């Protein structure tokens, strides 16, 4: 059998369904309503909450969440953002959260580490121009957070003294000593 660990892109959904008809296949990540394939769904709202709680505990009240496009196709991405925003709202600071997502036309592009890094970088540059009072920026995932970090540092700001940066997924890169990214494992209990 096959364990498929991400949602198939539109361009390969048909192939994945054909494969599932021949070989036992399960998707671990998000339940895609349009696919007739077994799936183990992750709770994508869950990681957003501890990221927000961590920042609230550090005293952050003006934060941004940087994301790939938040389209109907990417409902799971939206759940992570919603969990983050909900935590700030429940603490009484919902007005201090900015959600900055990439243009919807980028949703048709198969995401790569390079494109996610660039999204984090360019969206953060925009955020820093538009919002001088931000004290923390969160990336939907670690690759976006790496782009955020470079944009912050290039703007002559210090991490975490001036702006805190948080990622999600706890990728191997986040543990490199030279990077020092605060990140959360997606599989939060």
Per-region residue spans from a language model:
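Central regulatory/effector-binding core of bacterial HTH transcription factors
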Residues: 1-10
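Bacterial carbohydrate/catabolite-sensing allosteric modules
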Residues: 13-189
């Amino acid at each position: 059998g096959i364990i498929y660990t991400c949602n198939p892109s539109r361009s390969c959904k048909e192939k994945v369904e054909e494969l599932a008809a021949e070989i036992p296949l399960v998707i671990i990540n998000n339940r895609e309503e349009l696919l007739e394939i077994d799936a183990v769904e992750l709770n994508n709202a869950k990681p957003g909450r501890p990221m927000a709680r961590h920042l609230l505990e550090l005293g952050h009240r003006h934060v941004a969440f940087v994301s790939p496009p938040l389209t109907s196709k990417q409902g799971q991405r939206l759940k992570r953002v919603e969990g983050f925003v909900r935590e700030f709202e429940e603490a009484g600071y919902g007005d201090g959260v900015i959600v900055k997502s990439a243009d919807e036309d980028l949703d048709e592009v198969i995401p790569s580490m390079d494109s996610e890094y660039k999204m984090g970088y360019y969206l953060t540059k925009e955020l820093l121009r538009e919002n001088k009072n931000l004290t923390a920026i969160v990336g939907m995932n670690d690759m976006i957070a790496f782009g955020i970090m470079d944009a912050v540092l290039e703007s002559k700001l210090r991490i975490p003294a001036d702006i805190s940066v948080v990622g999600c997924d706890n990728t191997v890169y986040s543990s490199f000593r030279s990077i020092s990214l605060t990140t959360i494992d997606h599989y939060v209990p």
